[in-house]
Amino acid sequence: MQALYDVPAPAKLNLFLHVTGRRPDGYHLLQSVFMLIDWCDVLHFEVGGNGAVTREDLTSALPADDLVVRAARALQKATGCPQGVHIGVSKHIPAQAGLGGGSSDAASTLLALNRLWKLKLSRQQLHSIALTLGADVPFFLCGASAWVEGIGDIIRPLELEHQLPPAAFAVVKPEAGLDTRMIFSHPSLKRDSSCATISGFAATHYQFGSNDLQPVAQALCPEITQAINWLESKGLQGRMTGSGSAVFAQITHAVDLHDAPAAWHVKVCENLKSHPLADWVFG
């Protein structure tokens, strides 16, 4: 096998996000449920023999040293693999949205190259590499929606009794984006939410909890409030995902979403029962 085409990298929604504390080293302690949705970037991989890692942007331009390139090079370094790869990236998930697009691209890159380069690394071995790339990357290797704690490093796929029922969501990305660091460094960020339980979450699923980052994000980015108000005008209860600026709402009735501002990304998504590449790795 010398190539893999049309490799999906799905986005995620944070159904809730509580900040429960802060470590002495400054990292925040979180609780969240990360849910996979069917809004995907698409990646293409062609093996090269000279060890070079190159990337082609098939849609919007990406930074020269983005997470896709970093993931490929981290895998080379960890394994001593002499092979290279040319990666084509068709970007559909908006950046600075809280949807995890860059992290998902990195995870799909690890999974695809583990197969193409015949490395046979286990999920846990890939997880160790993913940790060096960013807090959200390991989640996209776990294969399913998950309960996430700690600094994002404690990941538990939802057990059968806690799994999410199928649902559709309106996801709205305003034109403006947000720098995550500005939110976590803000003095008014709530950092003392009570610890939640998986059973408590499972009792209400999509109505559970809140996003502790949202008040600060709304103060920094008024478009988030505008997007939530727009969803509410449709009879939908919006909340922010991750550190924004995207917001989402479960669709519970027929709704027309065609009158959004032209600069916004609006997409109706469904949740995924499992990651489309879940069976590409063992362990």
Swiss-Prot record:
Catalytic site residues?
K12, D136
Residues annotated as binding ATP are P94, A95, Q96, A97, G98, L99, G100, G101, G102, S103, S104
* EC number per UniProt: 2.7.1.148
Q: From which domain of life does this come?
A: Bacteria
Q: Name one GO molecular function term.
A: 4-(cytidine 5'-diphospho)-2-C-methyl-D-erythritol kinase activity
User: GO annotations under biological process?
Assistant: isopentenyl diphosphate biosynthetic process, methylerythritol 4-phosphate pathway; terpenoid biosynthetic process
Q: Which UniProt keywords apply?
A: ATP-binding, Isoprene biosynthesis, Kinase, Nucleotide-binding, Transferase
Catalytic activity as recorded in UniProt: 4-CDP-2-C-methyl-D-erythritol + ATP = 4-CDP-2-C-methyl-D-erythritol 2-phosphate + ADP + H(+)
- Matching HAMAP family, A to Z? IspE
Under the heading NCBIfam families, the entry gives:
ispE
Q: What's this chain's function?
A: Catalyzes the phosphorylation of the position 2 hydroxy group of 4-diphosphocytidyl-2C-methyl-D-erythritol.
**Similarity comment:** Belongs to the GHMP kinase family. IspE subfamily.
Protein name listed in UniProt: 4-diphosphocytidyl-2-C-methyl-D-erythritol kinase
